[in-house]
UniProtKB/Swiss-Prot annotation:
Protein's name in the database: L-ornithine N(5)-monooxygenase
EC numbers: 1.14.13.196
Residues that bind NADP(+): A286, G287, Q288, S289, N355, Y356, G357
Annotated FAD binding sites: E116, K117, Q118, P119, K120, F121, A122, W123, H124, Q135, V201, T517, L518, L519
Membrane found in the keyword field: no
Region (Disordered) location: 1-64
Length: 536
């Protein structure tokens, strides 16, 4: 989980990491979103710890500016996904109309539909750990930086819950992660009437593309309960599909005792059912999520043995100093966008320490103290410690051994040493991979529109990291899927009508910066997208 991390990763609008996982740790989410409270443990007798529970939500109001429409309507906008990114767009539309702006020429409410694969709104549900706090100011909420007078500010949420004065007395800009998640659910409840939950978008296809400029798109979605596939039509489509968990190839696929970090809080208690049992747990990764889970397991299961396995030699602290943090300012997008592909890649690589493969310093210090205490109290021999950090290691193999998993780890890039490899083997009851996310769902969703994309320029230096788009292979040659500054997909001239199109969110880090996958710019970016779509 990253310090500025903001977009849901267990649903359709997830916070983005940088592509696929990289070896063991995959540079899993860094530290620009949250920090972990160190005193996380509970005591529930011999029962497993339960997930965090929330009090009842009293809010029943709904947006008076966005109205439902029959499913066979031609929608003005369909959003694939309803996590924080799409939620921010709903808020921006509500605010625009509340300010007296017309999003439709006739002044009526726009016909909008959000399609979300989750059964209800959720944000980082698998990482709502006890004691965890945000590491991004509540001012970077759904609205404040765009419109501080909006109904959807975090402060207005506190006021509506009767906690504004008490929160002020905390003297912090950093709410509990669970409270911020409740704020997002409070915001989302205003728009429940225009959201179809349990609907996963499968494809976005242009209609009548042979007849001239495309004016409408067909969006196909599968109902998660019935399996039924339904089609919807819209002039504008926004894709905010989030990230898909990325697991190292060394781990067995779909094994019941192998979880991604996004599943931790929901599923680990179902596997590790007895709090005082001597469970053995391996965590893979070098970022904030990995460090938080490594620490949290020790607190929740006091008799456990834990292993933190990572390719990096050290846990590295995040750089959240104010000058460096300006990379997350909304205006920085305009600084980055005009630069060359090489310049953008260089800058993003330099700035990785703000967000990827890094950990909040206070958590690093806490874990170091734990390691020191073991050395002082048990032995200099780390193999005797119940909690170990295996740095500079990679997984050689994982084999099933009854109800357990046998892990073999070795030094990164180790060659044979006198005929042997420096390898260690141990058994675990659970593996948790905090190894990041892939951000490629939009590519396959738009497959039926690939032939409308411009052809790639022969001889141009193409980036494999999305810094100038994504290359896709068609029967008519290679095409380029890329976006403009306003996040609109750049189709070939004349193929899509000016008042129609497709927009992307949460997968444009290579062109729009590290903030693209984070909460930092949601309020301002959503305003820009609403202006672009509705020609404000």
């Amino acid at each position: 989980m990253s310090p500025h991390s903001e977009i849901s990763f267990s649903g359709s609008d997830a916070a983005v990491s940088n592509g696929t996982s990289n070896g063991i740790n995959g540079h899993s989410n860094g530290t620009n979103g949250f920090s972990n409270g160190h005193m996380n443990g509970h005591s529930n007798g011999n029962d497993a710890p339960t997930a965090v529970r929330h009090g009842p939500r009293v809010h029943k109001e709904r947006s008076r500016h966005l109205e439902t429409a029959p499913v066979d309507s031609e929608f003005d906008l369909i959003c694939a996904g309803f996590g924080p990114a799409s939620l921010a767009v709903a808020v921006a539309m509500h605010d625009a109309i509340a300010e007296g702006r017309n999003l439709r020429p006739d002044g009526t409410a726009p016909k909008v539909l959000f399609l979300e694969k989750q059964p209800k709104f959720a944000w980082h549900a698998g990482m709502l750990l006890p004691g965890a706090k945000m590491q991004i100011s509540f001012i970077k909420d759904m609205a404040t930086l765009r419109n501080p007078r909006s109904e959807f500010t975090f402060l207005n949420y506190l006021h509506s819950q009767g906690r504004l004065v008490d929160f002020t007395n905390l003297g912090t800009f950093l709410p509990a992660r669970t409270e911020y998640e409740d704020y997002l659910r409070w915001c989302s409840s205003w728009f429940d009437h225009v959201v179809n939950y349990n609907n996963e978008v499968l494809s976005i296809s242009p209609e009548n593309k042979e007849a001239g400029a495309v004016k409408t798109f067909t969006v196909q979605a599968r109902n998660g309960k019935t399996g039924q596939i339904q089609s919807f039509r819209s002039r504008h489509v926004l894709v905010a599909a989030g990230g898909q968990p990325s697991l190292p190839k060394s781990l067995p696929a779909k094994h019941p005792r192998v979880l991604h970090s996004s599943q931790f809080a929901n599923y680990a208690p179902q596997i590790l059912t007895k709090q005082n049992a001597p469970y053995r747990v391996a965590v893979i990764g070098a970022g904030q999520s990995a460090a938080e889970i490594f620490n949290n397991v020790q607190n929740l299961y006091p008799n456990s043995k834990t292993y933190l396995i990572m390719r990096q030699e050290f846990l590295r602290p995040s750089d959240d100093s104010p000058f460096v943090n300006s990379i997350f300012n909304p205006e920085y997008i305009d600084n980055l966008w005009p630069r060359s592909v090489k310049a953008r890649e260089t800058l993003l690589t330099e700035a990785r320490a703000t967000n990827y493969g890094v950990v909040r310093l206070e958590l690093i210090e806490h874990l170091f103290e734990k390691m020191y205490d073991q050395k002082r109290e048990i032995s200099d021999d780390e193999t005797q410690w119940p909690h170990r950090i295996l740095s500079g290691r990679e997984i050689a193999s994982v084999d099933t051994k009854g109800d357990a998993l046998e892990i073999k780890v070795q030094r990164v890039n180790d060659g044979p040493l006198d005929g042997f490899v420096d390898q260690e083997t141990f058994d675990v009851d659970l593996i948790i991979a905090a190894t990041g996310y892939k951000r490629s769902a939009h590519i396959d969703m738009l497959k039926d529109a690939w032939t409308m994309l411009p052809k790639t320029v022969s001889g141009r230096n193409e980036s494999p990291k999305g810094a100038n788009g994504w290359n896709v292979e068609t029967q008519d040659g290679e095409r380029k899927l890329a976006v403009a500054r306003d996040y609109r997909v750049k189709f070939s001239p004349g193929t899509v009508a000016d008042d129609s199109g497709v927009w992307l969110q949460g997968c444009c880090e290579g062109t729009h910066g590290l903030s693209d996958t984070l909460l930092s710019v949601l309020s301002t970016r959503s305003g820009e997208i609403v202006q672009s779509i509705f020609k404000q």
